[in-house]
């Protein structure tokens, strides 16, 4: 399982997904990226927005899972993403359930959702997957903090990736509410390096994601 101590043990790298000139997923180039990151001591890889999984073809999803799982070391935690559409994630659930990934991040859907609907949809996906998910909060209207807390208490969430951009990250009423209802040890800063210090020191978040470490771990 993904524990708070595991979240604290490594920066969370968010690598790109390498493709060939014909747009097929590249085994060799992804192996190079993963090996480079691991050589720098990074032990957690999260494949989501930077890997452009919002637009992955359903027909290549199983191949993606095999490649990123097969190229990473035994001590590396690899987390794939699903969605963002409900139908997409439910179709991806069987492949994930058949894999050994301990968790998967649900990419946030923008628009045409309600907080209650998000809770219901993520609950159904978590049950189909059979394991807790990563709740990715990117926009204030996506899910209310209290509903996020309900998901956590239900056991359906491994951790929360918080990524609402603020002009001043120290002034964040949503995050103020979130850490009141969810243990901050289960929340990571998910916007890169710039707000990470404030998120770690002021809000006591467990860790942070980084794209830069994919270049210079």
Regions from the language model: what does each represent?
Residues 1-145:
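Active-site beta->alpha loop and helix N-cap motifs at the rims of alpha/beta catalytic domains
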Residues 124, 128, 139-217:
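Catalytic alpha/beta core domains of metabolic enzymes, predominantly
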């Amino acid at each position: 399982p993904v524990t708070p101590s595991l979240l604290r043990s490594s920066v969370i790298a968010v690598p790109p997904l390498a493709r060939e000139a014909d747009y097929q997923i590249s085994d060799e180039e992804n192996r190079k990226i993963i090996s480079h990151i691991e050589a720098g001591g990074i032990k957690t890889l999260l494949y989501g927005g930077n890997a452009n999984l919002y637009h992955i073809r359903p027909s290549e999803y199983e191949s993606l899972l095999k490649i990123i799982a097969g190229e990473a070391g035994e001590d590396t935690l690899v987390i794939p993403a699903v969605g963002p559409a409900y139908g997409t994630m439910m179709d991806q659930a069987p492949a994930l359930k058949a894999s050994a990934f301990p968790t998967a991040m649900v990419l946030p859907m923008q628009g045409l959702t309600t907080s209650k609907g998000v809770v219901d949809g993520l609950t159904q996906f978590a049950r189909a997957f059979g394991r807790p998910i990563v709740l990715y909060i990117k926009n204030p209207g996506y899910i209310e903090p209290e509903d996020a807390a309900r998901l956590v208490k239900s056991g359906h969430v491994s951790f929360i990736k918080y990524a609402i951009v603020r002009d001043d990250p120290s002034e964040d009423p949503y995050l103020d509410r979130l850490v009141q209802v969810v243990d901050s040890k289960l929340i990571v800063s998910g916007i890169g390096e710039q707000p990470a210090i404030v998120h770690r020191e002021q809000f006591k978040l467990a860790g942070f994601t980084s794209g830069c470490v994919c270049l210079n771990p």
